């Protein structure tokens, strides 16, 4: 009888361990649109993941949450922003999936064509370093400003307003917190808005933007990011594979109509 009890104890222990593994929650911080929507779709197609989506609100730094262990991954940022955050926080993170692009767009409630922009028009742009640079390159691509010589590749040269060489319309560049820019549309002539914030505001980038960032060779693909210690965690790897799957790519294409563009799962 005592001999028989050991296998039973082993079975009980195995069941308990299996339960604990299954119960382990994978907490991922994400912007509400489209990131959290995409993650919630993953929950539907892969019930083996015990995924908890933490929707970010303004003022919360998802990389600080990750560094502090409050979440196991985040999904909201592109590589240039991530690299700036690593420097600012003194942390090293790990990219485990490259998922989609949200083209930056120029929007207006005042004009219907960029040719109609008046002299000394006000332009709201993101105030964080990487997206500010991205906005200036978009304004240059649409003929509104010209940056200094050599500023042709946003992946290589980060631009600031001091790098504007030509501003023929004397545009006034106003740096604003990215989530607040859609609310400023009635107060400025032009607004350069990140794709996710445009979608949250009810805009359709592929239709409403007067100028839209090209997806070709775009360095701003959105990433699933974790810590080096967790990058080989089975749940993290499973989520990464799901996000880069053809199913998720199809979901993005069908639901965002060119306003969000998949870069994996083609």
Question: What is the role of each PLM region?
Answer:
Residues 17-23:
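Sec/Tat signal peptide C-region and signal peptidase I cleavage site
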Residues 29-52, 61, 65:
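Short, polar/charged alpha-helical segment
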Residues 45, 60-74, 87-88, 136-138, ...:
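Short helices/loops that flank or line small-molecule/ion binding pockets
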Residues 50-58, 148-156, 170-176:
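Short beta-strand-to-loop elements that line the ligand-binding cleft
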Residues 84-96, 109-111, 185-187, 192, ...:
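Ligand-binding "clamshell"
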Residues 96-146, 249:
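A conserved helix-loop-strand patch within extracytoplasmic ligand-binding domains
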Residues 97-108, 133-140, 199, 203-266:
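Periplasmic-binding protein-like
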């Amino acid at each position: 009888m005592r001999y028989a009890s050991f296998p039973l104890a082993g079975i009980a222990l195995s069941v308990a361990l299996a339960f604990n593994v299954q119960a382990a929650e994978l907490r991922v911080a994400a912007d509400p649109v489209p990131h959290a929507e995409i993650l919630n779709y993953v929950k539907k197609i892969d019930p083996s993941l015990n995924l908890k989506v933490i929707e970010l609100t303004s003022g919360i730094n998802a990389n600080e949450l990750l560094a502090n262990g409050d979440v196991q991954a985040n999904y909201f940022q592109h590589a240039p922003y991530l690299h700036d955050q690593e420097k600012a926080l003194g942390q090293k993170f790990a990219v485990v999936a490259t998922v989609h692009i949200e083209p930056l767009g120029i929007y207006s409630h005042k004009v219907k064509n960029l040719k109609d922009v008046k002299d000394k028009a006000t332009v709201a742009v993101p105030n964080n370093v990487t997206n500010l640079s991205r906005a200036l390159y978009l304004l240059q691509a649409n003929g509104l400003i010209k940056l200094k010589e050599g500023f042709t590749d946003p992946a290589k040269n980060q631009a600031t307003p001091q790098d504007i060489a030509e501003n023929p319309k004397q545009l006034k560049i106003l740096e604003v917190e990215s989530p607040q820019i859609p609310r400023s549309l009635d107060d400025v002539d032009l607004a350069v808005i990140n794709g996710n914030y445009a979608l949250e505001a009810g805009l359709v980038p592929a239709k409403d933007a007067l100028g839209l960032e090209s997806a070709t060779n775009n360095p701003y693909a959105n990433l699933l990011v974790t810590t080096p210690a967790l990058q080989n965690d089975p749940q993290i790897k499973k989520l990464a594979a799901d996000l880069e799957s053809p199913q998720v790519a199809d979901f993005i294409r069908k639901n965002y109509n060119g306003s969000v563009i998949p870069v994996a799962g083609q």
